[in-house]
Amino acid sequence: MLTYETWEENDVSFSEEDETKGALSVLSWAYKEYKSEIVYACSFGVEGMVLLHLINQVNPSAKVVFLDTNVHFQETYELIQKVRERFPSLNIIEKQPELTLDEQANLHGDKLWESNPNLCCKIRKILPLEESLANEKAWISGLRREQSETRKHTKFINQDHRFRSIKVCPLIHWTWKEVWRYVYKHSLPYNPLHDIGYPSIGCEKCTLPVGEGGDSRDGRWAGKVKTECGLHYQ
């Protein structure tokens, strides 16, 4: 088994010359390699809808973790329910932070997402994912190279130093248009916020719509020197 510790033995390669640009091959390998010791960390963005559909074809009872920060858009929570109805066999876990919002405010002050967004992300996303990955060998992410400068060198299989894990990214070669083409082709549910200028959807407090021609991550932590929550630093 390929693990964080045995990374030097990595000789896995995949062709992107197929209908899913390698995504199904990568997922098939991942579930064969890690069996029950792999989880998909899903934010329920539009890429997530594609991955859930593909994962359901490979492993209908796969584990899916949603990092419920308690400050997501209502539309996101409603979408999760639609996904549960569409893919009833998937094991969707809504992972809660250790601190409630009130407890966080008592310790660190109100609106931590404004005063210290890095700490807020650590408490409400990074630490919960660390807990979720504690007993896993690998995790799946919907990163695409096209999304931003910080993601353009992502590979199908990555040694993840942040979580000392293997990060599997099946959609790295997909374009924004290809993602949407797949969603429409398979009549997949998606977050209606995408239709009103939100290409990337995170917490309600830290996500704004993006103007025409903007980077897909421009609406995240707008006005701050921050483009990532910290889950995907290598």
From Swiss-Prot:
Catalytic activity: [thioredoxin]-disulfide + sulfite + AMP + 2 H(+) = adenosine 5'-phosphosulfate + [thioredoxin]-dithiol
Active-site residues, Swiss-Prot/TrEMBL: C229 (nucleophile)
Enzyme class: oxidoreductase
GO molecular function: 4 iron, 4 sulfur cluster binding; adenylyl-sulfate reductase (thioredoxin) activity; metal ion binding; phosphoadenylyl-sulfate reductase (thioredoxin) activity
Pathway stated in the Swiss-Prot or TrEMBL entry: Sulfur metabolism; hydrogen sulfide biosynthesis; sulfite from sulfate
Domain of life assignment: Bacteria
Entry's Gene Ontology cellular component terms: cytoplasm
Pfam family, one: PAPS_reduct
Keyword terms, alphabetized: Cytoplasm, Iron, Iron-sulfur, Metal-binding, Oxidoreductase
Residues the entry annotates as binding [4Fe-4S] cluster: C120, C121, C203, C206
UniProt-listed Enzyme Commission number(s): 1.8.4.10
Major localization class: cytoplasm
Subcellular localization(s) per the UniProt record: Cytoplasm
Cofactor(s), by name: [4Fe-4S] cluster
Keyword Cytoplasm carried by entry: yes
Protein family (similarity comment): Belongs to the PAPS reductase family. CysH subfamily.
PANTHER family, sorted: PHOSPHOADENOSINE PHOSPHOSULFATE REDUCTASE
Chain's role: Catalyzes the formation of sulfite from adenosine 5'-phosphosulfate (APS) using thioredoxin as an electron donor.
Protein name: Adenosine 5'-phosphosulfate reductase
Organism: Bacillus cereus (strain ATCC 10987 / NRS 248)
